[in-house]
């Protein structure tokens, strides 16, 4: 069984959460289904008549990103989401969102976009496709699971890969606690929902 079914009984409003396959009595209740796992895509991008890149009006639009050197781009890819199977977490999800579509559109996709925006200032655009490419993935995954990093900004000199000239840029750095763990500006919302 690839779905979780939430059944809300009439009159009492009591909810049951069916996470395992098998026969269950619905008793005229209203059911809502969620996939146990879901792949969230953000891979669509197109060009305008003027030749500019855009994601406007597309299904599954790529997320914009701005790097420390003010380079701009889009992040394309996907994230696998796995729903919790505990009643407490499923109850929160159902009460706050009420459907899989709202969960994806109002919690998951906006938070993926927020995390990608937060990753940009941690590196230059060239670093994002070279030596820090894997860091970008690790930063995004960690922030999705645990919350947005607290950062400080420092002026650093970097050699421009195209002009070979030294440039001063504002680059964000992660703030760490005394145990060497990243400090967080906010707790990740996925922690609350399991």
Question: What positions do the PLM features span?
Answer:
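Amphipathic, coiled-coil-like alpha-helical scaffolding segments used for oligomerization/assembly
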Residues: 66-69, 74-75, 103-194
């Amino acid at each position: 069984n690839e779905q979780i079914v939430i059944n809300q009984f009439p009159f009492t409003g009591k909810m049951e959460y069916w996470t395992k396959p098998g026969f269950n009595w619905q008793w005229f209740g209203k059911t809502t289904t969620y996939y146990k796992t879901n792949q969230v895509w953000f891979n669509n991008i197109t060009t305008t008549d003027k030749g500019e890149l855009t994601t406007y009006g597309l299904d599954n639009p790529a997320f914009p990103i701005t790097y420390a050197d003010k380079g701009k781009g889009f992040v394309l890819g996907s994230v696998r989401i796995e729903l919790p199977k505990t009643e407490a977490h499923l109850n929160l999800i159902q009460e706050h969102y009420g459907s899989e579509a709202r969960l994806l559109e109002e919690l998951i996709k906006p938070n993926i976009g927020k995390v990608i925006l937060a990753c940009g200032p941690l590196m230059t655009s060239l670093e994002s496709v070279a030596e820090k490419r894997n860091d970008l993935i690790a930063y995004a995954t960690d922030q999705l699971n645990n919350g947005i990093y607290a950062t400080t900004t420092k002026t650093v000199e970097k050699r421009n890969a195209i002009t070979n000239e030294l440039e001063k840029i504002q680059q964000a750095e992660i703030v760490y606690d005394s145990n060497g763990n990243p400090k967080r500006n906010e707790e990740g919302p996925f922690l609350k929902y399991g």
